[in-house]
Amino acid sequence: FDDNDVSEVVIHGEFPDACYRIGNSGFELDQANMVVTVWASALEYRGEICAQVMSPYIVPVKLGVLEEGTYQIKVRDVPNVTASLTINKRTTESPDDFLYAPVEGADIKKDAAGRQSLTLMGSYPYTFWGCLKIKEVRMVDKDDVLVIQPIMEHLDGEACENYKHSFDETFGLSAPLEGESLLHVRVLNGNSYNRFVSLN
């Protein structure tokens, strides 16, 4: 992230059974010491029949616009879990104004030769004229996080023939992912889609 972006931290784990639901989340910022403490709560519903299975959860916590520097990330009440977040100096005075695709799903797949590729799924918004399509996908892999920017363009005429609003497109990776990685996809309206994948 740059110092004119809305930064985000992602909390993930597993509930012991399906009786739990994600509750509220938030953060506390100690700017003087460059420390961000995040937290997320869980709601337990014991008055119903719950499947006795591990239930994964993922909670994105928006931190707002942070000043340049490297922050220590802590999790409230879990002192042994820490991470770092580097906020770079912005290269332009305004935030990125790309028109991102409304991605609703992302996955990493392997072909028969073991080569990895990224698949993005979603539905384009309707327009009064022409159509929207993904023009390019930029990816930055750093510290087990693959930041994905699916940039759309507005087209018309022949480019919109046989147009489908739903998309399921695959893109090659410049380098393979290993172990557990977070897919952080920038999407339309300033939001993000996040998913953890485990690759052996």
Regions found by a protein language model. Give the residues of each.
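Exposed, flexible binding/inhibitory loops of compact, secreted disulfide-stabilized domains
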Residues: 1-200
